[in-house]
Amino acid sequence: MELRFPRFSQGLAQDPTTRRIWFGIATAHDFESHDDITEERLYQNIFASHFGQLAIIFLWTSGNLFHVAWQGNFESWIQDPLHVRPIAHAIWDPHFGQPAVEAFTRGGAAGPVNIAYSGVYQWWYTIGLRTNEDLYTGALFLLFLSTLSLIGGWLHLQPKWKPSLSWFKNAESRLNHHLSGLFGVSSLAWTGHLVHVAIPASRGEYVRWNNFLDVLPYPQGLGPLLTGQWNLYAQNPDSSNHLFGTTQGAGTAILTLLGGFHPQTQSLWLTDIAHHHLAIAFIFLIAGHMYRTNFGIGHSIKDLLEAHTPPGGRLGRGHKGLYDTINNSIHFQLGLALASLGVITSLVAQHMYSLPSYAFIAQDFTTQAALYTHHQYIAGFIMTGAFAHGAIFFIRDYNPEQNEDNVLARMLDHKEAIISHLSWASLFLGFHTLGLYVHNDVMLAFGTPEKQILIEPIFAQWIQSAHGKTTYGFDILLSSTSGPAFNAGRTLWLPGWLNAVNENSNSLFLTIGPGDFLVHHAIALGLHTTTLILVKGALDARGSKLMPDKKDFGYSFPCDGPGRGGTCDISAWDAFYLAVFWMLNTIGWVTFYWHWKHITLWQGNVSQFNESSTYLMGWLRDYLWLNSSQLINGYNPFGMNSLSVWAWMFLFGHLVWATGFMFLISWRGYWQELIETLAWAHERTPLANLIRWRDKPVALSIVQARLVGLAHFSVGYIFTYAAFLIASTSGKFG
């Protein structure tokens, strides 16, 4: 018999309909469901695929370096980072007429190019790269790593090199190696790079392999380290009039705690960053020696978990049984990893703009907006994925006997209380926030803006004041010059920090008012509702009062037939599906808020945000409509301009988004009838009927159509906003 796709499922391969293709694609990565899978092979397959993932990442980053070196303007950008537009790569399109060629030829290029809004120029400049040759070297090195990763992946699929199951289940060794090796050593190596290459480069000293051993990063070398006078490394830092990349105003310190920003670049002091990475390295190198392996010393994670019984016994058996539950469930481990990574990615979004670490990136407004939005969307997808795999864990891997009365079992026991509290919080936030917005809308519409309900966010302002913001006059903690907190840090980082917090030209602790109060609560509504849907999906994944045997139906099922009413749309997959819409809408509010507040800050008219953000019409008119006007003007009677591509993408994004509803708001029978009619017509049409298909065409399943609809909705939503964001920001600020 001929081998047909999918090879991993003979049952599916023999399906006579097009279901074979779609279900084959859908389950290609669900290794657990494949024929002849064993637990050991499952782990080996996933392990080998990690090498492929690394290869793709290295190839991609290599491509970035290569194209900028080949077609970019890195060397001329370095001469004037604030006015030269960084080029990502050249573009060639046979459709371009002369107006298009002229519109897209910028940044000092000879032909049409794309401008880089990713921040790579600022990053490479900060870490000490200075020439195209440096970029080519980096590209080749990453290409080498990519090849190495592919070889590693292939190697670990060979019988002699396949790790055993016991190797994968050795949690302590893995933790030690990842903490010390991955985080500790890499942070130490990065500190080394910053101290030996990046900091000298910021002071006009070009360190490469040929002079690496001759140039001391600090005049006294290792002397202060060996004699215990570590504070010497912080003496003589760069002065406030230091010109980045030159010797003018440069100091000699390598590890400092200055606080605040470099006045010229508006980014964190490189010597502060090096100090931070050294501290991280120190912590992780210690952490990576904590767990017991072959040597009989250190902690056993299992013992740690078993020992933690809650006091008084009222909270059950604590963490007993958790070690084996987590160690034997890939979905649990993936859920934990995704939850952590999702939070970290969102934190990256928040910190990249408020505490920028790359030189001059804070003044590249479009890049700031693009990076914030990019990281928040990625965080949203990763976090919803965490709950999806949490639900799969409960369906496939959870063993009630192993987890009797521990924290997992008690979560399931108390799920009604958890879900109803989340529901109450969501309802409260939703009705009150919408009520305030709508009230304010009506007041504006009737010409009585003074009757708006405007609430000052006094608690948030108090927190900002505690961190040193003096605008509000709270006179507390770091904003009080007489307090112990103020005096303790006065000789170290505090002056730099206070200067940064109270200088209104950066994004650190922006002044907030009633508009911020409302939008924060709108975002809180979105976060709580998304969480409600995800938590309910996971906690009800095994069963509910309505459907106690739900776990027997798997992760994604449409319904249990017509005989059991009400069993449609309640699979754990359906909860994930619904949560993604809420996640996207929530991040929409987050990014609208961030972008509008920053546009008014950058333009110097913060009063526009403050006055218009307290009612919905203000958001629709003064943010969305006002800022999309240039976008809609991408093509006009006078020809085209450099925003035309974004105008096209804006339209295309709407098209993709709207297409999603065709899959979301229709039923399977309609499509089945349509397909059969089209197949009938095809078979009776001359010439066309020469083309035959082996698989009988059938409509997508309900779950698949939902996935296709969700994918279109998500992609269209993000494309539309990306075009709006980049065009409206670059149209104003270049």
Swiss-Prot record:
Binding site for chlorophyll a B3: M662, Y670
Taxonomy, superkingdom: Eukaryota
Residues annotated as binding chlorophyll a B1: H654
Annotated membrane topology: Multi-pass membrane protein
Predominant place of localization: plastid
GO cellular component: chloroplast thylakoid membrane; photosystem I; plastid
Record localization: Plastid, Chloroplast thylakoid membrane
InterPro entries, A to Z: PSI_PsaA/B, PSI_PsaA/B_CS, PSI_PsaA/B_sf, PSI_PsaB
Single biological process term from Gene Ontology: photosynthesis
Enzyme class name: oxidoreductase
Catalytic activity annotation: reduced [plastocyanin] + hnu + oxidized [2Fe-2S]-[ferredoxin] = oxidized [plastocyanin] + reduced [2Fe-2S]-[ferredoxin]
Binding site for phylloquinone: W671
GO molecular function annotation: 4 iron, 4 sulfur cluster binding; chlorophyll binding; electron transfer activity; magnesium ion binding; oxidoreductase activity
SUPFAM superfamilies: Photosystem I subunits PsaA/PsaB
Acyltransferase found in the keyword field: no
Ranges annotated as spanning the membrane: 46-69, 135-158, 175-199, 273-291, 330-353, 369-395, 417-439, 517-535, 575-596, 643-665, 707-727
Protein family: Belongs to the PsaA/PsaB family.
HAMAP family: PSI_PsaB
Subunit structure, as described in the record: The PsaA/B heterodimer binds the P700 chlorophyll special pair and subsequent electron acceptors. PSI consists of a core antenna complex that captures photons, and an electron transfer chain that converts photonic excitation into a charge separation. The eukaryotic PSI reaction center is composed of at least 11 subunits.
Role: PsaA and PsaB bind P700, the primary electron donor of photosystem I (PSI), as well as the electron acceptors A0, A1 and FX. PSI is a plastocyanin-ferredoxin oxidoreductase, converting photonic excitation into a charge separation, which transfers an electron from the donor P700 chlorophyll pair to the spectroscopically characterized acceptors A0, A1, FX, FA and FB in turn. Oxidized P700 is reduced on the lumenal side of the thylakoid membrane by plastocyanin.
Name of this protein: Photosystem I P700 chlorophyll a apoprotein A2
Organism name: Oryza sativa subsp. indica
